[in-house]
């Protein structure tokens, strides 16, 4: 057994007071790894620098960042008390916390730091479109814009979240640049209706369609609308539609109208021609008449037929041949029905002054009489020496007497009677009448108004 003086249980009471005194004497020196801050006491020769090369704080590791530490002067360990560390985040990450950490006496660094991935502002969803991103709005995420059908992308299609937390390029938008679609109908050539120069043409109005939102704001038609009567010729029809973006779509087509024609007819010599419609188109009717003193021979009217040939025969105007050999006055008047007007001048003797003066005035106004289809009939004398004369033709005394009796013309005095084309007694005179007064009367007759229009078209006039 060993010496009793070396037994531990015997030495402990003697050593313990010495250890306590030692701890009391050196409180400013600290203990490596204790975390206690040393006291700066000039009276103690132990210096803080004694522990400057002793690991103190835990090593720093920053995810997605780099740490650059500087140990206290003369030190080696970069976790010693007083070590300063600069923190830098890698590209695309940003520092949250202090950019410089100091190893403190409490064995803790002066701050907690973290490198977080940078994030760009959330992109605005474009109207009528959208976008798709690889990694949301984080750094280096790539987003691609797209547009709904009918819309066109305006701006950059692809943007990337950059290191400055901004997106590359400007935000894109979706605009309606595509014009609306419209399809016009196909209208075949049309033939004008009978006796007309037009034809009614109808079609279904085209319906436009917008490729974007399907909404059209306006439809404009240039040309005649469907259901109109189109005249002969080539007609351009144009439809224009607009969408809400003011894009326009247009379609065009033509309506061609053809008039079937028989060829122009001419008025007969010494006659008139009055035609309906355009005068030679399918269904047109041409009516013919002759000037005073002439009779119509041939067809009084001709029609342009579907085979483009005129009906009837070609008319002509022949000088009127009055038959004075008829047996009755009525038969004589029938020859003038709807052809001529009559001015019957009756006198008991050729020496009658009123008769002679009146006949002289009528001879000077012969053009006006012919223009108004007036035939002068002279009844001179008293039966049985009565003479009836129509220009160069002499009627029998008995026929002349019948005419006086039929029209109730006085036998023994000067008298004049105006008879219209329907055989009606229109006016009587017992004294002289000027040609102008006579013409003014005749010009009021219903048939005369139509004649005046035709004569004006033909250029037939007189100075009286």
From Swiss-Prot:
Annotated GO CC locations: autophagosome; endoplasmic reticulum
Positions bearing carbohydrate: 34
The organism's taxonomic lineage, starting at the top: Eukaryota, Metazoa, Chordata, Craniata, Vertebrata
GO biological process: autophagy; negative regulation of cell proliferation involved in contact inhibition; phagolysosome assembly; positive regulation of extrinsic apoptotic signaling pathway in absence of ligand; response to endoplasmic reticulum stress
PANTHER family tied to this protein: HYR DOMAIN-CONTAINING PROTEIN, SUSHI REPEAT-CONTAINING PROTEIN SRPX
Designated gene of the protein: Srpx
Name of the molecule in the record: Sushi-repeat-containing protein SRPX
UniProt keyword annotations, A-Z: Disulfide bond, Glycoprotein, Proteoglycan, Repeat, Signal, Sushi
Segments forming domain Sushi: 57-117, 118-176, 260-319
């Amino acid at each position: 057994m060993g010496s009793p003086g070396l037994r531990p249980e015997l030495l402990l009471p003697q050593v313990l007071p010495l250890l306590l005194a030692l701890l009391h004497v050196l409180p400013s020196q600290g203990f490596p790894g204790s975390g206690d801050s040393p006291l700066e006491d000039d009276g103690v020769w132990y210096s803080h620098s004694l522990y400057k090369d002793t690991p103190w704080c835990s090593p720093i590791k920053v995810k997605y960042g780099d740490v650059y530490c500087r140990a206290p002067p003369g030190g080696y360990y970069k976790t010693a008390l007083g070590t300063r560390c600069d923190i830098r985040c890698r590209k695309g990450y940003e520092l949250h916390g202090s950019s410089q950490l100091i190893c403190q006496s409490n064995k803790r660094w002066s701050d907690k730091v973290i490198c977080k991935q940078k994030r760009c502002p959330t992109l605005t969803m474009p109207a009528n479109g959208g976008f798709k991103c690889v990694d949301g709005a984080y750094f280096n995420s790539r987003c691609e814009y797209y547009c709904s059908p009918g819309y066109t992308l305006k701006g950059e299609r692809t943007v990337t979240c950059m290191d400055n937390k901004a997106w590359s390029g400007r935000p894109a938008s979706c605009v309606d640049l595509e014009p609306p679609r419209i399809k016009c109908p196909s209208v075949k050539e049309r033939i004008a209706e009978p006796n007309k120069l037009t034809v009614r043409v109808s079609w279904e109005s085209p319906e436009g369609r917008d490729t974007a939102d399907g909404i059209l704001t306006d439809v404009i038609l240039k040309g005649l609308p469907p259901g109109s009567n189109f005249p002969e010729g080539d007609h351009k029809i144009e439809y224009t539609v607009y969408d809400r973006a003011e894009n326009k779509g247009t379609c065009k087509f033509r309506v061609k109208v053809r008039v079937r024609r028989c060829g122009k007819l001419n008025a007969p010599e010494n006659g008139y021609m009055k035609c309906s419609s355009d005068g030679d188109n399918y269904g047109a009717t041409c009516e013919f008449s002759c000037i005073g003193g002439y009779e119509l021979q041939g067809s009084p009217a001709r029609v342009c037929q579907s085979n483009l040939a005129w009906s009837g025969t070609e008319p002509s105007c022949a000088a009127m041949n009055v038959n004075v050999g008829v047996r009755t006055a009525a038969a004589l008047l029938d020859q003038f029905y709807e052809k001529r007007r009559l001015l019957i001048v009756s006198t008991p003797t050729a020496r009658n002054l009123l008769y002679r003066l009146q006949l002289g005035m009528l001879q000077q106004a012969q053009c006006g009489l012919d223009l108004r289809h007036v035939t002068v009939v002279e009844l001179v004398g008293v039966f049985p020496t009565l003479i009836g004369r129509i220009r160069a033709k002499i009627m029998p005394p008995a026929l002349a007497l019948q005419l006086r009796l039929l029209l109730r013309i006085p036998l023994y005095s000067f008298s004049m009677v105006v008879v219209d084309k329907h055989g009606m007694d229109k006016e009587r005179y017992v004294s002289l009448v000027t040609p102008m007064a006579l013409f003014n009367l005749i010009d009021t007759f219903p048939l005369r108004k139509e004649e005046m229009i035709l004569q004006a078209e033909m250029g037939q006039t007189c100075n009286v």
